[in-house]
């Protein structure tokens, strides 16, 4: 089956984080840093290097670093066709670009763009619609990691529970208790 990859998908985010460009680079462009705020990561930290994110039991994403310009710009591609159980020629790679811009006052803005091309199938739109809000908690993690634990090894802990109260109030209470 021949497909035309002419439907563009693109998400853009911007987050201000504490730290120098070098500290932010260590967090976003090294296996140790990404493992601390995003997902357990294996990475050859160079252009052309391989990349693997562990997303859970028996689930991961493989990719390649396509641009490496410390401490300013990182680009990597992932095979989102494989993630979705599709044929590789059905989709372009999922490309993520991180740009670090120093700001006054000891902060940086991190601009993140995720993009790719597909065929316009309904499941593709659903994938991209779900991807957008999925990034947001990770940006909170990045901000907290750089504010309280820059350069330290860390791992994520996911705890789930049902609570009948207001989610915002509960989250605020939890953050205050953890001094975050």
Give the residues covered by each predicted segment.
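Short acidic N-proximal helix/loop "leader" segments that mark the beginning
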Residues: 1-10
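Short, surface-exposed coil-to-beta transition loops
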Residues: 12, 59-63, 92-96
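A short, structured loop/turn motif at beta-sheet edges
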Residues: 21-22, 66-71, 100-109
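Hydrophobic pocket/interface hotspot
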Residues: 24, 28, 34, 51, ...
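Short beta-edge strand/loop motif at the mouth of beta-sheet-based domains
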Residues: 32-64, 73, 152-163, 171-180
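Short, solvent-exposed secondary-structure boundary/capping segments
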Residues: 72-79
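Beta-strand/loop substructures that line and gate deep hydrophobic ligand-binding cavities in soluble
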Residues: 81-131
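A conserved amphipathic terminal alpha-helix motif
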Residues: 120-171
């Amino acid at each position: 089956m021949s497909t035309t990859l002419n439907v563009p998908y693109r998400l853009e985010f911007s987050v201000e984080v504490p730290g120098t460009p070098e500290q932010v680079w260590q967090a976003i462009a090294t296996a140790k840093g990404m493992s601390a705020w995003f997902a357990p990561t294996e990475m050859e930290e160079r252009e052309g290097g391989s990349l693997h994110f562990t997303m859970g039991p028996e689930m991961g994403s493989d990719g390649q670093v396509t641009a490496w310009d410390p401490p300013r710009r990182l680009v990597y591609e992932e095979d989102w066709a494989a993630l979705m159980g599709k044929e590789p020629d059905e989709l372009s790679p999922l490309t993520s670009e991180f740009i670090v811009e120093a700001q006054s006052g000891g902060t940086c803005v991190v601009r993140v763009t995720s993009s790719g091309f597909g065929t316009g199938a309904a499941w593709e739109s659903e994938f991209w619609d779900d991807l957008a809000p999925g990034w947001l908690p990770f940006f909170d993690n990045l901000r907290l990691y750089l504010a309280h634990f820059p350069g330290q090894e860390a791992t994520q802990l996911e705890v789930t529970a049902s609570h009948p109260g207001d989610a915002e109030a509960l989250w605020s209470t939890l953050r205050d208790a953890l001094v975050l």
